[in-house]
Amino acid sequence: VGRVHYDLSTDFFEAMLDPNMQYSCALFAEGDDLGSAQLRKLDWICERVRLRPSLRLLDIGCGWGGLARYAARHYGCQVVGITISREQFRYAQRWCRGSDVEIQLRDYREVTGRFDRVVSVGMVEHVGYKNYRTYMRTAARSLAEDGLFLCQGICGNFSRVHTDPWIERYIFPNSMLPSLARLTRAAEGVFIVEDVKNIGPNYDPTLLAWEKNFRSAWPRFADRYGERFRRMWRFYLLSCAGAFRARSLNVFSIVFSKEGSAIGSSVRDERQAVPSSRTAVLESIGNCAPCELHR
């Protein structure tokens, strides 16, 4: 999948995505454009794992480095990001230069070192059901005893061992959408679930914004990719938007702590407090009405 999908030209993704190169579900409030909604998502993720200066953060599946760069610059963290895409690796290395970020080209199972926080956004869809347990154990091995792990990704409503054949063939080879049940089962005896949020309704407007950007930018890429690719890519974006609107797909954001860790009790307590001015963004989440954005 790294070669087939994520190694498409970086300028193509730059044209479709927001300035922070976020290729995952945004978090919309009324009046947000794509860029604002993706910034809201970045802050929300950083606050969910209680980032603060000097913490070491591992970003599993860091993409083009947007979250890693944001966490280092706005939360003062030391970040290691990993990706299996050579295009993403080269781009992220350049883009994160000057920030306290190290980008590595490696499989998540090869990660070394210990981190105060681990995040994995939009990557678990590429793990596969046979490897969910390994994925959880790898995150646990990489996490400090009092750390937090955030796993966020697209989930189906049923536990399956296959994926949509069209998506498998043309868009994401070897991909598989987990269910929430599968992920939490894989974490049994490894992690404690501290919090779960479903932000899936926000993916419909995210995908529609990408499709709009894609259509606007298409004249620049028509000669390079051709009409067949244009039809395929629009079908991918719009069919996925329809699946989220129909609630066939969801996006679960799960915060885990290690079994026996004392940090879990304070996670729930601190949800009632505002530890920094940046968490003001969270107050608006309760007022979000993502489904109304379709009207």
Model-derived segments and their meaning:
Residues 54-61:
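Conserved class I S-adenosyl-L-methionine
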Residues 1-48:
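Conserved Class I S-adenosyl-L-methionine-dependent methyltransferase catalytic core
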Residues 109-118:
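A short acidic, Gly/Pro-enriched loop at the edge of an enzyme's catalytic core
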Residues 133-145:
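A short glycine-rich, Lys/Arg-flanked "PGG" loop and its adjoining helix->strand segment in the class I
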Residues 154-264, 271-272:
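Substrate-binding/catalytic lobe of Class I Rossmann-like enzymes that use SAM or dcSAM, i.e.
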Residues 98-108:
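Conserved SAM-binding strand-loop segment of SAM-dependent methyltransferases
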Residues 146-153:
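Conserved beta-strand signature within the Rossmann-like core of class I S-adenosyl-L-methionine
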Residues 64-75:
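Conserved SAM-binding loop of SAM-dependent methyltransferases across substrates and taxa
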